[in-house]
Amino acid sequence: MRTSQYLLSTLKETPADAEVISHQLMLRAGMIRKLASGLYTWLPTGVRVLKKVENIVREEMNNAGAIEVSMPVVQPADLWQESGRWEQYGPELLRFVDRGERPFVLGPTHEEVITDLIRNELSSYKQLPLNFYQIQTKFRDEVRPRFGVMRSREFLMKDAYSFHTSQESLQETYDAMYAAYSKIFSRMGLDFRAVQADTGSIGGSASHEFQVLAQSGEDDVVFSDTSDYAANIELAEAIAPKEPRAAATQEMTLVDTPNAKTIAELVEQFNLPIEKTVKTLLVKAVEGSSFPLVALLVRGDHELNEVKAEKLPQVASPLTFATEEEIRAVVKAGPGSLGPVNMPIPVVIDRTVAAMSDFAAGANIDGKHYFGINWDRDVATPEVADIRNVVAGDPSPDGQGTLLIKRGIEVGHIFQLGTKYSEALKASVQGEDGRNQILTMGCYGIGVTRVVAAAIEQNYDERGIVWPDAIAPFQVAILPMNMHKSFRVQELAEKLYSELRAQGIEVLLDDRKERPGVMFADMELIGIPHTIVLGDRNLDNDDIEYKYRRNGEKQLIKTGDIVEYLVKQIKG
């Protein structure tokens, strides 16, 4: 490709509304342009990267035995009503009616559509297992699209769905998809972790996320410093303290704390160790409960894990925190003064709280706290559960090493769905015993557009993007200095361009009438891995300057050796 026949569209300045580095660099490198909130046009450079990602995904899915299909973006509402997700999915599901007043949705995912297809196409266990995938546009009406294509409303996704007659068969495909995803992200040159995860609104039993490690990530990824254990922080188990609860050394005392409405204020004003404080959070109880609210207690320096809390049988789903009005109606005190003593509603405490003694907590009286609280002396030990987020340094749940926490960007997710959708949509086949058998399902997603942004978040420097070779828009940039004034430079540039293309190498020849500084800046911004610079001074010695984008190293290579050298660098 020649720049004179290409839409380069690079920008010198960073757009003001671009928050994260991937959004900034995708705009500056001429990869995308914003059409509306959460909607982007992909320009030629962006499309080239996108296609590289797609091709790797497609190759590995095919290698794993999956079969490619294509399903409509527009889906009839009755399928979503049949599955029960019409009400469950919420406002992210874009709903509309056609001219015949028939309701439809823009598909955020395709469990309903594929299950409907399979219930009409398959009849016997002999046709299974099967695994179908597509790479297709999805739409989720995000309330606040942000971070460019990282959290956009329209995006490209690879979604796959497998069908089985046994859990054992599902496990085999699940393991194959786990391995395929690992190959996909390894081929792309990404530093990633596969972590245990919550199944969320998709449902099902087992689940793993594939997280690209990056400081800008929205998720906390937890992993052991010794073993292979890794999990999303939502799912990581916080192990109970090994040490037995210390004996009480203080009497419980009611203390006036009118200006301490938060743990931080309590600690500062009374010089308390934060590890000796407890915070109390009130959430709505499950419908039909004899109490409207449930009290959840975690140590002052810990955070409530909302996913774990929502799974408590007495807690309403989705988890909803009580308003001050609702709290006062039940406890007669405000949010800054709550604690376990004389709490008139059910209480669940974290494992760490259960091991505490001589601790401080609200007295359920405005402006007052109890100091020196001890379980079973001042208040009965309530139900104990794991309801907090782990922190760095906690013991690993597998008993090996301690936990580290890094930020991650979720780029893939695999689920064992079980029979959630097949039961709802009555998808079954005749089993080996001749009886009707509901199908067992798995689903497997990769955010293709998100992978592009995640790769940038992990691969950039002060000059621009530093693409891993496998997904770079071009493999080689040819920069001929003053080619429009030097016939020798122009002739060699054309010769190398032809020879490299003949070797199957993707080349961008910068044949613009631009200053060398502009040419260098653009190629580094775009992130092309290999650059060769042709100039009269070096050609006098039969040399060409070669530069590797990732480490910035330069070397002079003889003109007659450059093609062979590049082929070896790129193809090995």
Swiss-Prot record:
<dbReference type="Pfam" id="PF00587">
    <property type="entry name" value="tRNA-synt_2b"/>
</dbReference>
<keyword id="KW-0436">Ligase</keyword>
<dbReference type="InterPro" id="IPR033730">
    <property type="entry name" value="ProRS_core_prok"/>
</dbReference>
<keyword id="KW-0648">Protein biosynthesis</keyword>
<dbReference type="InterPro" id="IPR045864">
    <property type="entry name" value="aa-tRNA-synth_II/BPL/LPL"/>
</dbReference>
<comment type="subunit">
    <text>Homodimer.</text>
</comment>
<dbReference type="InterPro" id="IPR007214">
    <property type="entry name" value="YbaK/aa-tRNA-synth-assoc-dom"/>
</dbReference>
<dbReference type="InterPro" id="IPR004154">
    <property type="entry name" value="Anticodon-bd"/>
</dbReference>
<protein>
    <recommendedName>
        <fullName>Proline--tRNA ligase</fullName>
        <ecNumber>6.1.1.15</ecNumber>
    </recommendedName>
</protein>
<keyword id="KW-0030">Aminoacyl-tRNA synthetase</keyword>
<dbReference type="InterPro" id="IPR002316">
    <property type="entry name" value="Pro-tRNA-ligase_IIa"/>
</dbReference>
<dbReference type="Pfam" id="PF04073">
    <property type="entry name" value="tRNA_edit"/>
</dbReference>
<comment type="function">
    <text>Catalyzes the attachment of proline to tRNA(Pro) in a two-step reaction: proline is first activated by ATP to form Pro-AMP and then transferred to the acceptor end of tRNA(Pro). As ProRS can inadvertently accommodate and process non-cognate amino acids such as alanine and cysteine, to avoid such errors it has two additional distinct editing activities against alanine. One activity is designated as 'pretransfer' editing and involves the tRNA(Pro)-independent hydrolysis of activated Ala-AMP.</text>
</comment>
<dbReference type="InterPro" id="IPR002314">
    <property type="entry name" value="aa-tRNA-synt_IIb"/>
</dbReference>
<dbReference type="InterPro" id="IPR036621">
    <property type="entry name" value="Anticodon-bd_dom_sf"/>
</dbReference>
<dbReference type="GO" id="GO:0006433">
    <property type="term" value="P:prolyl-tRNA aminoacylation"/>
</dbReference>
<comment type="similarity">
    <text>Belongs to the class-II aminoacyl-tRNA synthetase family. ProS type 1 subfamily.</text>
</comment>
<dbReference type="GO" id="GO:0002161">
    <property type="term" value="F:aminoacyl-tRNA deacylase activity"/>
</dbReference>
<dbReference type="InterPro" id="IPR004500">
    <property type="entry name" value="Pro-tRNA-synth_IIa_bac-type"/>
</dbReference>
<dbReference type="GO" id="GO:0004827">
    <property type="term" value="F:proline-tRNA ligase activity"/>
</dbReference>
<keyword id="KW-0963">Cytoplasm</keyword>
<dbReference type="GO" id="GO:0005524">
    <property type="term" value="F:ATP binding"/>
</dbReference>
<dbReference type="InterPro" id="IPR006195">
    <property type="entry name" value="aa-tRNA-synth_II"/>
</dbReference>
<keyword id="KW-0547">Nucleotide-binding</keyword>
<keyword id="KW-0067">ATP-binding</keyword>
<dbReference type="InterPro" id="IPR023717">
    <property type="entry name" value="Pro-tRNA-Synthase_IIa_type1"/>
</dbReference>
<dbReference type="InterPro" id="IPR050062">
    <property type="entry name" value="Pro-tRNA_synthetase"/>
</dbReference>
<dbReference type="GO" id="GO:0005829">
    <property type="term" value="C:cytosol"/>
</dbReference>
<dbReference type="InterPro" id="IPR036754">
    <property type="entry name" value="YbaK/aa-tRNA-synt-asso_dom_sf"/>
</dbReference>
<dbReference type="InterPro" id="IPR044140">
    <property type="entry name" value="ProRS_anticodon_short"/>
</dbReference>
<dbReference type="Pfam" id="PF03129">
    <property type="entry name" value="HGTP_anticodon"/>
</dbReference>
